[in-house]
C-alpha cells in the first residue's frame, strides 16, 4: 500500500484523536461526552456516502463515548444505517454538545452558529477549514 493511501486511511482516526486532545486541553470529560459530527457524505452538497472517511472518525470516537450524533441534511439515513450501521439525523438537534466536528462542508453549515451548539467550554474542530478561525479550537 502506498504511503499516500496509508495516510489517507488514517485521517479519520487522526481527526478523532485531535478532537479528543482539544477536549482534554479544555478540561472536557471525554468519557461519555456528547459529540456532534456535522456531515457524513463523501463530499459537500452531495448525498454520496461511498468511501466516506467520516465513518472512521465516528468509530474512533466510539472508543470514548457512544453519545455521538451525526447530522447530515444530504445523507439518506436509511442508506447510511444499512451501509455503516450509523444512525444519522437530517434535522439539527436542539442540544448542547461537548464537541462539534465539522466533517463535511455542506452549504447548510455556512450560517450555522457552531458556538451555540457546544457547551460553555466545548470544542469545535473543523476538518475542512470551512469555519472562521476564531470559532474553532482545532482544524486539519
Describe each PLM feature range.
Residues 1-140:
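Structural/interface elements that position substrates and couple domains in central-metabolism enzymes
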Amino acid at each position: 500500500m502506498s504511503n499516500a493511501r496509508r495516510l489517507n486511511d488514517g485521517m479519520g482516526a487522526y481527526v478523532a484523536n485531535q478532537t479528543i486532545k482539544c477536549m482534554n486541553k479544555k478540561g472536557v470529560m471525554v468519557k461519555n461526552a456528547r459529540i456532534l459530527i456535522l456531515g457524513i457524505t463523501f463530499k459537500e452538497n452531495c448525498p454520496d456516502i461511498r468511501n466516506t472517511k467520516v465513518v472512521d472518525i465516528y468509530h474512533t470516537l466510539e472508543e470514548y463515548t457512544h453519545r455521538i450524533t451525526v447530522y447530515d441534511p444530504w445523507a439518506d439515513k436509511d442508506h447510511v444505517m444499512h451501509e455503516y450501521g450509523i444512525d444519522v439525523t437530517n434535522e439539527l438537534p436542539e442540544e448542547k454538545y461537548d464537541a462539534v466536528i465539522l466533517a463535511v462542508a455542506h452549504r447548510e453549515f455556512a450560517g450555522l452558529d457552531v458556538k451555540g451548539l457546544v457547551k460553555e467550554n466545548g470544542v469545535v474542530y473543523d476538518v475542512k477549514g470551512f469555519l472562521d478561525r476564531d470559532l474553532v479550537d482545532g482544524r486539519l
